[in-house]
């Protein structure tokens, strides 16, 4: 089994520029930043992706993300910010430990988030919404 680099960072066995830590989460600088200040927020417990993330860990990661995003806003004064979270290879996930990217943005920074040039629709919006609502309703039963 390949070792999880993020778990090694949490355990102090791999280096990282840590900017925030609490009992449940860790935030550190991305080693391949899309822009200056690009930061990752992770749960300390190994969780592969959003599908495996429990509600408590999700809340902890979001609390830490908000706190770090506010600090980035004050420290670096970006014009905006992207929060990015990818799941599985098809979704662009490269490290299989849940993580949130906080990417500061400036006008003219040239950074583009991938998006097809024309909208590709395999099902109508209403049909997709109905299927999603159906799955959410199943969870509440």
Model-derived segments and their meaning:
Residues 1-141:
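HIT superfamily nucleotide-processing domains
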């Amino acid at each position: 089994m390949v070792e999880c680099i993020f778990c090694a960072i949490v355990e102090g066995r791999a280096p990282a520029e840590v900017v925030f830590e609490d009992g449940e989460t860790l935030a550190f600088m991305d080693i391949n930043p899309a822009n200056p200040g690009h930061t990752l927020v992770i749960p300390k417990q190994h969780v592969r992706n959003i599908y495996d993330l429990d509600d408590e860990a999700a809340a902890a990661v979001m609390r830490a993300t908000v706190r770090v995003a506010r600090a980035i806003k004050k420290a670096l004064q970006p014009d905006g910010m992207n929060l990015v979270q990818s799941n599985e290879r098809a979704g662009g996930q490269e490290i299989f430990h849940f993580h949130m990217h906080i990417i500061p943005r400036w006008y003219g920074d040239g950074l583009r988030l991938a998006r097809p040039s024309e909208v590709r629709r395999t099902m109508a919006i209403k049909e997709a919404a109905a299927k999603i609502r159906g799955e959410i309703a199943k969870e509440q039963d």
